[in-house]
Amino acid sequence: MSEYTLENIAQVVEILREKSPLTHCITNVVTVKDCANAVLAVGASPIMANAPEEAEEIVGISNSLVINIGTLTKEQIETMKKSAKFAIENNKPFILDPVGVGISNIRNQTPIDIITNSKPSIIRGNLSEIKAIAMMYDILDECTMAKGVDVAQCDIINKDTLISNCNLIKNISEKLNTTIAVSGPIDIISDGHDVYTIENGDAMMSRITGSGCMLGCVLGAYLAVTNPLEAAITGTLVMGIAGELAAKTARDNNKGTGSFGIYLIDELSKLNKSTILSQSKLNKM
C-alpha cells in the first residue's frame, strides 16, 4: 500500500507531458471533441476510433484505452468488447466509464460483459452508476436506481455521508478487484486497500455536457504513465482544480457556461506543479 503525496501527483503530471502517450478513447458522440481536447490539454495524444475492424490495431499502438458507453450502438459495443479483450491480452491498461448504467438493459449488459471478460484497471462513474454496477454483482443487497448520467439525490456525497460511502466504495473496489473512482461534490477513489477523497471542483462543471466524460479520458491519459490508483487520483485532482480555476475566471468576467467550457480546457493545459501544490484538497481516509 502506498501513500500518494502532492509531490507524487505533480511528478505524474510532468511525466505525462514529457511522454505524450497515445490514449485511445472510445467515447460518445456528444462529447468526443471535448474529450479529445481534454486529453491534448493534459499532454497526451488522443485517438478516437470506433470501427470494430480496426479495434485490435488501434489498441495495439495505444498506451491506454478508455471505454465510455454514453451513446451505444451495436457496432460500438462490438468495438468496445474487442478492444477491451485485446487490451487485457496485451497488458494495456483501460478505464471503463459506464455512463447511465442502471437505466436500460443494454447499458447494464455492456459493462457487465466488459468487466467479467476483461477486467478494467479503473471504473469511473458517479455514485449511482457505481452502485448500479455493484448491484449487478450482488455486492449491494438493496435496490438503487440510476438517474441517467446524473446522480440520484440520495447518492450525493457530502460530509454527512462521506465515511459510509468511503467504506462502500472500498468494499466494491475490493470485490471487483479494480480501482474505483467516484465523482461527486466530494470525489472518492479506492483500490480496495486505500481510500482517498478530493474536494476540488465547482458546481459549474455539472452545468456543461461532458465534464464526466472528459474526466474519464483524462484518467485514461494518466493511466498510460502510472498505476491505476495514482492515475485516478491525479486525473481527478487535475480536473477538479482546473474546474475551480475555470469557474472563477468565468464569474470574474461575468461569463456563462459556454465560456466556462473553454476556460476549463485552458486551465487543464496550463496546470503546473505550483498550482497543484497550492490548490489541491486531497485527503487519505
Swiss-Prot record:
Catalysis: reaction(s): 5-(2-hydroxyethyl)-4-methylthiazole + ATP = 4-methyl-5-(2-phosphooxyethyl)-thiazole + ADP + H(+)
Keywords assigned by UniProt, alphabetized: ATP-binding, Kinase, Magnesium, Metal-binding, Nucleotide-binding, Thiamine biosynthesis, Transferase
A Pfam entry, by short name: HK
Molecular function via GO: ATP binding; hydroxyethylthiazole kinase activity; magnesium ion binding
Cofactor: Mg(2+)
Annotated EC: 2.7.1.50
Coiled-coil positions: none
Binding site for ATP: R124, S183
Residues that hold substrate according to the record: M48, G210
InterPro entries (UniProt xref): Hyethyz_kinase, Ribokinase-like
GO BP term (any one): thiamine biosynthetic process
Pathway(s) this gene product operates in, as recorded in its UniProt entry: Cofactor biosynthesis; thiamine diphosphate biosynthesis; 4-methyl-5-(2-phosphoethyl)-thiazole from 5-(2-hydroxyethyl)-4-methylthiazole: step 1/1
EC class: transferase
Keyword Protein biosynthesis: no
Family recorded in the similarity comment: Belongs to the Thz kinase family.
Function field: Catalyzes the phosphorylation of the hydroxyl group of 4-methyl-5-beta-hydroxyethylthiazole (THZ).
Protein name according to UniProt: Hydroxyethylthiazole kinase 1
